[in-house]
Amino acid sequence: MNDTEKRKKKMKVLLVNGSPHKDGCTYTALCEVSEALNEQGIDTDIFWIGKKPLSGCIACKSCMKNNKYVFHDSVNEFLEIAGDYEGFVFGTPVHWGGASGGITSFLDRVFYADLNGGGNRFLLKPAAAVMSARRAGTTATWDQMNKYFGLMQMPIITSRYWNMVHGANPEQIKQDLEGMQVMRVLGNNMAFFLHCKNVALKMGISMPKQEPMVFTNFIR
């Protein structure tokens, strides 16, 4: 499918649930973002990374040849469909003041495989991170999550506050009225960006020219 055909299709955003709980607090926050996107004419799907252990990258370099991982798990399942989406929202619970171990291994491998395998699934596609916590650690987790998007040239979508919700269960999350509003504003802002990008492409504004990557090691 070429760029023109893609622009004629309805735009889609994939929301990734990085919690071991399929229908828990993180899911509740993502659903609020999803509903806001839907109201603005953007289709959405939710992808759960699952609760099975996810290995970190083992530096085998197989992704450079196959554009996927040597382990067949939810990472490869995600890579197979990621190119069909125009934007991404990654959700995670806060574990020990940072992102969950599952989503950390998941994103390490997803972006490394795409970058080294030449998949080009994420270039200039908007991304956002959503954090769910009982109490603290959300801002440190947000910083951690945004680093992935910064390396992949993914515009980072924000809300009117940092993208976090608080509560120990879905019912408590829904009582975080400000947090839920932040989720809705986030969805609206991502929809606005996607519509603006779509108009720009229709008007003939080209994507930025990509330069060959240059690597400079910190050796001095």
Region roles according to the model:
Residues 70-161:
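Helix-loop-strand module that forms the ligand-binding subsite of alpha/beta enzymes
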Residues 42-52:
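A short beta-strand-loop structural module common to alpha/beta enzyme folds
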Residues 12-40:
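N-terminal beta1-alpha1 ligand-phosphate binding loop
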Residues 11, 39, 155-220:
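Glycine-rich phosphate/pyrophosphate-binding loop and the adjoining helix
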Residues 52-82, 215-219:
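Cysteine-cluster motifs in flexible loop/terminal segments that predominantly coordinate metals
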Residues 1-10:
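Short, Lys/Arg-enriched N-terminal segments with co-localized hydrophobic residues
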